[in-house]
Amino acid sequence: VYIHAPAAADDGSTFAAVVNDELGLALVVEFSARELPYLMEWKSMASGDYVVGLEPANSSVHGRGYHEQRGDLHHLPAQASETKHLRFTVLNAPEDISALRRRRDDLLASARRVRGGADRLALP
């Protein structure tokens, strides 16, 4: 499992994507880093099986104790609910995939200017 710190716009918007250039396809997951500050990526590359998971989340895979020690455990009171916003998009046009890469590059450049560096978005 990889834990990413995605670069985000001023409003918290960010995305992760998986691109298959051979097939000319991309899957984009857009979300708010304010609502879901963690992004986990996991892979299974066993023979005959290739799976990748992109999981925006409000806590990491480190567990409750880790977040309690850090003071950032996400609490949800009894009977409460929350709404999170995610958008999934499939791209199948070369120009759309190129635009996605430009969007990634712009977001990373902006984040580096603001905070002096940013982790890679999950996109080659």
Show which residues each predicted segment covers.
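Active-site pocket scaffolds in enzymes
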Residues: 20-124
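Active-site/ligand-binding surface loops and adjacent short beta/alpha elements
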Residues: 1-28, 33
